[in-house]
UniProtKB/Swiss-Prot annotation:
The gene is fluC. This is Fluoride-specific ion channel FluC. GO terms for biological process: cellular detoxification of fluoride. Na(+) binds at G75, T78. It comes from the Bacteria. Belongs to the fluoride channel Fluc/FEX (TC 1.A.43) family.
Length: 125
């Protein structure tokens, strides 16, 4: 139960921070381009790289700290960072074909799922 609570706390903090970054970007840059989403995705990818190296490799941190920072905080801040780490991990293990398939499938299927969800709701509503 404590592990789920750590994920929830980290997720809440990450989500609130994502909201503030989005609002800041909207005020600074305007609504013409999703700058806030781009910013959290890029920053989240950088931070997951830092956390993955420090927390799992350099300091051998506890499962609880990993859940709080990586699963919780970055999961709330951006899920794109987890996707990127998974893809890089495949490439680092020498599984370039699997990495390419994972990237193409993730982006392609996710886009298709959004289009399908939009189409279904537009047809029903």
């Amino acid at each position: 139960m404590i592990q789920a609570l750590l994920v929830a706390v980290g997720g809440a903090i990450g989500s609130v921070l994502r909201y503030f970054v989005g609002q800041w970007a909207l005020r600074l840059m305007g609504p013409a381009f999703p700058w806030g989403t781009l910013a959290v995705n890029v920053v989240g990818c950088f931070v997951i790289g830092v956390f993955a190296e420090l927390v799992t490799r350099k300091f051998n941190a506890s499962v609880e700290l990993r859940l709080l920072l990586i699963t919780g905080f970055l999961g709330g801040f951006t899920t794109f960072s987890a996707f990127s780490l998974d893809a890089i991990s495949l490439f680092e293990r020498g599984e370039a074909v699997a990495g390419g398939i994972y990237i193409a499938a993730s982006v392609g299927l996710s886009m298709a799922a959004v289009f399908a969800g939009l189409a279904i709701m537009r047809a029903l509503v």
